[in-house]
């Protein structure tokens, strides 16, 4: 790192990788002139676990439990992209009911991720109360996840061709009750935070990104939409069944930390709208179709009594990934989560490239913090919303 030659008595400060305000194991080498930030160099890789190489030595079903460790606060999205890639590669159609279930789970996971962004973000700014409030709602989402998937965090719920299990009896009513309750919770957050003068002093005109800069840096998600770019893959790519619901893309034009906060608050409201519509319109029918496809290929294939005993434990069948390549993407809470998949007529992917939104969004941090105050670093870093599990992979 080159230091400016014109300044004297510069101080170099290490923030992290074990720092009380750091969002994971991230290290920042910050060069200071008093309180002013002259330079900032992020050091990554402390949580690198070779996720892409592991994928090349596993079948998709064997790899599914690994992917929930990328963004461990929004695990439904990492599962979704992992099963979407082979589904698109082999043109596997999923039942309508399974698609609706996926949308419900994805939007619940989006709310849970935004909540656990909001709490630490406010704690970074010195407000401890919202940090405790967000866990009140987040635990209710975990209760819904646990009832449907058996796990509160690492769900392992999505499958190629559908989902692992149907929604249990009474789950839909509980989900609707949560939606009604959570809308009141969002109003409470806005009354507590949005017009607070201390909060506004910390976030207004801090970390400004223009629309042109956001596009040139490859930013996505709330980082992009807060700079005036109305780009949401749920509207652009129309994956799953998002085109069957009425909702609006949340965006702001100011491009600062306050705009990114407002976008995420608005997204939680829109997620509730999508969930309510999906729950009310959810059709009947199967929740997966790979078993049906497998039995159609075999002559005189039928279930026997012994197999029925293990119906819940039957894994999805493996299949060869044809020799072709494609890029699949979804709108995760932090931005565009993508997979570049190359098949090689084998059970394992030949190449499995992950495009994590947090890694791309983090690259603009040194530019944002230059000429700012030391205290603004945590404001800007918090507004980016990163999880080091997906940044380092």
Swiss-Prot record:
Per the record, the similarity remark reads: Belongs to the complex I 49 kDa subunit family.
Q: Which residues form a coiled coil?
A: none
Name of the protein? NAD(P)H-quinone oxidoreductase subunit H, chloroplastic
Keyword vocabulary terms for this entry:
Chloroplast, Membrane, NAD, NADP, Plastid, Plastoquinone, Quinone, Thylakoid, Translocase, Transport
A Pfam family (short name) is Complex1_49kDa
Gene Ontology annotations of biological process type:
photosynthesis, light reaction
> Do you know which PROSITE patterns this protein is assigned to?
COMPLEX1_49K (PS00535)
- Name the source's superkingdom: Eukaryota
The keyword RNA-binding is assigned to this record: no
Transport as a keyword?
Answer: yes
Q: Which compartment or compartments is the protein found in?
A: Plastid, Chloroplast thylakoid membrane
Q: List the disulfide bonds.
A: none
